[in-house]
A protein has these predicted regions:
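Post-signal peptide N-terminal segment of secreted/secretory-pathway proteins
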Residues: 1-42
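Eukaryotic tandem repeat interaction scaffolds
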Residues: 152-178
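Structural motif
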Residues: 24-28, 63-69, 110-122, 161-169
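Short loop/turn segments that connect beta-strands within beta-propeller blades
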Residues: 29-33, 70-75, 123-126, 169-172
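Repeated scaffold domains used in trafficking and secretory/extracellular systems
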Residues: 2-13, 42-53, 86-95, 137-153, ...
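Residue-level marker for isolated small/hydroxyl-bearing positions within beta-strands
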Residues: 19, 57-60, 104-107, 158-160
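A short beta-strand motif characteristic of beta-propeller blades
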Residues: 1, 32-39, 76-83, 128-139, ...
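Hydrophobic beta-strand positions that form the internal "hydrophobic ladder"
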Residues: 16, 54-56, 99-102, 156
Length: 178
């Protein structure tokens, strides 16, 4: 049995991740039952799961924020440390179905102005020579980007308080519609 006090879930066609919001446990399920368990070192804010069961999570504490990808055994695949002064506060995370592309939405503030930031990280060949695997970065002034998701392998979207953007491109996403 599992003790999940504040459950949140992300579902794909073949996998599901159940996480304890503000807790430290993520359970990954597939058709044949429990596929894996992840125990985090910091409280969980958001999760996203790929078809294979790779999990991406936004973790936060009072002093630090991280975006980490785990395999189904709980091993860390990728770890991005974030800061308010750097990329901003991570608001949402989404993984492509194959787990190769990660979309992260950040909220950044400076001198009383807000900016939504949308970053894409490619863990395949397209991102292997890039710093932190980052292949696309776009800033949206006076916009809070709140929710992002992949529609298919080639298309993703982000929704903000005054904008909706659609990106296309399997390896290096480019803004297609605003």
């Amino acid at each position: 049995s599992y003790q999940i006090k504040n459950p949140m879930i992300d579902i794909t066609e073949k996998s599901a991740a159940v996480a304890d919001k503000e807790g430290n446990d993520i359970l990954v399920f597939q058709e044949d039952g429990l596929k894996g368990e992840v125990h985090t070192t910091m409280p969980i804010e958001k999760v996203s799961v790929s078809e294979q069961g790779i999990v991406s999570a936004i973790l936060k504490s009072d002093t630090a924020m991280k975006v980490i990808c785990y395999d189904t055994a709980g091993n860390i695949l990728v770890e991005h440390k974030t800061s308010l002064a750097g990329s901003g506060y991570p608001v949402d995370v989404a993984l492509s179905a194959n787990g190769q592309m990660m979309q992260v939405l950040y909220l950044y503030t400076q001198d009383g102005r807000i900016e939504g930031r949308l970053h894409y990280y490619n863990f395949g060949d397209a991102g292997k020579d890039k710093t932190d695997h980052q292949v696309t970065k776009k800033n949206y002034k006076n916009t809070i980007m709140a929710s992002g998701f992949f529609m298919d392998e080639n298309t993703s979207a982000a929704i903000g308080d005054n904008a909706m953007v659609i990106y296309t491109g399997k390896d290096i996403p480019k803004q297609n519609v605003k």
